[in-house]
Swiss-Prot record:
EC code: 2.5.1.78
Superkingdom in the source lineage: Bacteria
Self-association state and partner proteins as the record states: Forms an icosahedral capsid composed of 60 subunits, arranged as a dodecamer of pentamers.
Family: Belongs to the DMRL synthase family.
Protein name, entry field: 6,7-dimethyl-8-ribityllumazine synthase
Listed PANTHER family: 6,7-DIMETHYL-8-RIBITYLLUMAZINE SYNTHASE (PTHR21058:SF0), 6,7-DIMETHYL-8-RIBITYLLUMAZINE SYNTHASE DMRL SYNTHASE LUMAZINE SYNTHASE (PTHR21058)
Length: 153
């Protein structure tokens, strides 16, 4: 037997957690995610968005959303751009670990849509220019994974 999710979001309830730090990028990721959800049939009133200060704070609110029983999937969006210190490494590692851990602990998909880039140009490219919009891609993944995970409910 082959299991796969389909890309119809009708009837799905989705939570989105967005880091405000680098908002000029994360707002574009959010726009892409909202566009992706709506284009695939998720109703606007079935989407809740929570803004957090930065990427490091994403896992806590994603956990609260995922454990609420209200959502079929949670999308995490943020942008971490390497600077001159090791702060980048700590933030990236902890956010990735936090979201990955939630994905395994929760009964719903928690999608990692956090950009971790070396340069601001790379972040801009992934927020809707040359390299597509990772927010949109995260929305599509959330829809597919929500349906796929329900096959084992």
């Amino acid at each position: 037997m082959v299991f796969e999710g389909h890309l119809v979001g009708t009837g799905l309830k989705v939570g989105v957690v967005v880091g405000r730090f680098n908002e000029f990028i994360t707002s574009k990721l959010l726009g892409g995610a909202l566009d992706g959800l709506k284009r695939h049939g998720v109703e606007e009133n079935d989407i809740d968005v929570a803004w957090v200060p930065g990427a490091f704070e994403i896992p806590l609110i994603a956990k609260k959303m995922a454990s609420s029983g209200k959502y079929d999937a949670v999308i995490t969006l943020g942008t971490v751009i390497r600077g001159a210190t090791t702060h980048y490494d700590y933030v990236c590692n902890e956010v990735a670990k936090g979201v990955a851990s939630l994905s395994l602990q929760m009964d719903i998909p928690v999608i990692f849509g956090v950009l971790t880039t070396e340069t601001i140009e790379q972040a801009i490219e992934r927020a809707g220019t040359k390299a597509g919009n990772k927010g949109y891609e995260s929305a599509v993944a959330a829809i597919e994974m929500a349906h796929l995970s329900k096959q084992w409910a």
